[in-house]
Amino acid sequence: MKTNQLFLLTGLAAVTLPACVQKDKKGVSEKPMNILYIMCDDHSYQTISAYDHRFIETPNIDRIANEGVRFTNSFVANSLSGPSRACLLTGKHSHKNGFTDNTKRFDGSQQTFPKLLQQAGYQTAVVGKWHLTSDPTGFDYWNILIGQGDYYNPYFIDNGEKKQIEGYATNITTDLALDWLDNKRDKNKPFCLLLHHKAPHRTWMPDTCDLDLYEDVVYPVPETFYDKYEGRIAASEQEMNIIKDMDLVYDLKMADKENEIHTTTGLEENGRNLYNRMTPAQKAAWDKHYDPIIKKFKEQKLTGKALAEWKYQQYMHDYMRVIHSVDRNVGRVLDYMEKSGLLENTIIVYTSDQGFYMGEHGWFDKRFMYEESFRTPLIIRYPAKIKTGSECTALVQNIDYAPTYLDIAGIEKPDYMVGTSLVPLFGGETPRDWREYLYYHYYDYPAIHMVRRHDGVRDSRYKLIHFYGEKNEHNDAINCNELYDLQSDPNELNNLYDNPEYADIQTRLQARLDKFRVDQKVDEY
């Protein structure tokens, strides 16, 4: 596959990389594949119709699945925005890449797949949400949101220069990506573009043109919405409950002009500031939609179950409107790729930095190793290698993305990357030596939502989770385990740990967890 070698120095070590001319198995030169990686923030697999039709139709995202492969057992290594992105870039678990929680600063001097692609002749770019504190490295072009970014009139940092752009973040991010593809890149080089949307991150603010969508839809309340968390100590301590922790003003847009609606979460002022940053035209559209909802809400004086389910419906309506905008913009990108002749020579990936709760267990947000958070969508279109409309059930994780992109470019995976290239799965078969277990580790505690630190392992059917932590001003010490049979208990309600009937399974998973900790030199658990 290699035609010549580029000898480059990275730090003190020389590494050998192939130039960007590849050969097929017959020795005929083939044009290197471009890479387009589209990642949203907190896009649940439940709200992509290629996975689930209960909530919304996403025809443009589905197009990628229909013309490629849908991974049904795709997971993350740490279900939190910054750490997940660090895992993506490095192919390493959080304790190895140094970005364990959102208080950290990503060490941009470490090796990443964009750097290796860049050194091999690719032109690299990242547009949209970065959320790693330090400036991007390994990119010829970067234009990123500051921190979490804002939905309306956000500030971007364009290769070091701060600029505010009027408009809606999802549209702007797409505009910037298409502008780079069309006008700012060297079209003689293969490219790798990371297109990172802020959406649908909290606070789920829809585009003004989408505000009235789904108004008459009543979303089914999850069967676990009123979960009591029996046998699950950490789950009972969290602060991400729609009923208790979702703010009426910040999250649900009840910023009334009379200033009569007040909340106790400390987020009310932030919610009003989100409205105040809008232009007069944006405010007018916003008021036209939300003022009648606010008026009716104040008149109803809801309490108890009625208030809980009103909050759920309001949350779901706004989340789906934001997803509608994402899907529309994915369509814009696909249309451009097709019209510009790039579609067939570009591998297109759609994913999220982690999963998200759509009311399951009464929650919003992510963080836990439970399925809705741990699992993430992954869809790949690669016409030359992947059968259209296919499905892959192998266990995959976001630490696999970096090795995959290197493999596609003909670059040997560095030894430090613990992820595995997904390319062997593209043919439709799972290799016999493919992994049987995944390792997960969450560190961000004490912090917003108060989810305890934990690690664990999952195989194709069972999951073992270990929660740990010393006593602090917020909670008592915790040292407990949870075991789930995902086949008989997909909602993870029945903790089977120390159940004699599952002793052999518990022993097997514990041995695998211990091995991961030793092999990967895990520093806390």
Range-by-range predicted roles:
Residues 483-484:
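Short hydrophobic beta-strand that contains or immediately precedes a catalytic carboxylate
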Residues 2-480, 490-525:
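Formylglycine-dependent sulfatase
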Residues 487:
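Residues forming the ATP-binding cleft of Hanks-type serine/threonine protein kinase domains
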